[in-house]
Amino acid sequence: MTEHTERLPFQQGEIAVLRQSIDISEELLSEHYKISTSQWKRYRYDIQSLKDLQTKEITDLAFAQIYRYAQSPHERLRGSETGDYFKICLQDHVVRRAVKRDATIQLFPLSLYIVTHELIHVIRFAKFLQRFDSTAAEQEVEEGRVHALTFKLLENCKIPGLPEVLSAFKDCRTMETFFPA
């Protein structure tokens, strides 16, 4: 299989599933972390799928990568405004490969797990509970911590296929990589 065919972006139906998982994840995290709709604005992030990624933001080794930028390309900041912008780079082809490889894994619960996991990282970075620039050992500890938080948040959700995803990834240690821009 060529690199081009392996890296096919999500189609319209898959994007709709992804949007649904983002909505549910944000709702769950809002309740858990007591984040109001207006407070979400201070968590400067975007979730992009493969078709909207730069070449450097694409990998075959993780479901997602988080890039930290000084600002969103869609924002104009005044000199007094600062803060990191986190770009969650979903790797459509890696997610799709996992769904095809395991018949018990479905796109919606898997994308819900991935998005929830990544947004927990963003919240932790924004609240300074974890440094973005950390050693490999610190990142590994943080991954374990975020996997545990994600599992705990999702374990009682009544979503078809989610128990299979939680079971499949219970021992997973790496979901993504972090890169300063």
Regions found by a protein language model. Give the residues of each.
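Long, well-structured alpha-helical subdomains associated
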Residues: T2-I15, R19, E155-A181
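Long, hydrophobic, amphipathic alpha-helical segments used as structural scaffolds
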Residues: Y33, I123-K127, C157-G161
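A short mid-domain helix/strand-loop element embedded in enzyme catalytic domains
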Residues: K87-D92, E118-K127
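Short alpha-helix carrying the canonical HExxH Zn2+-binding catalytic motif
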Residues: Q106-I120
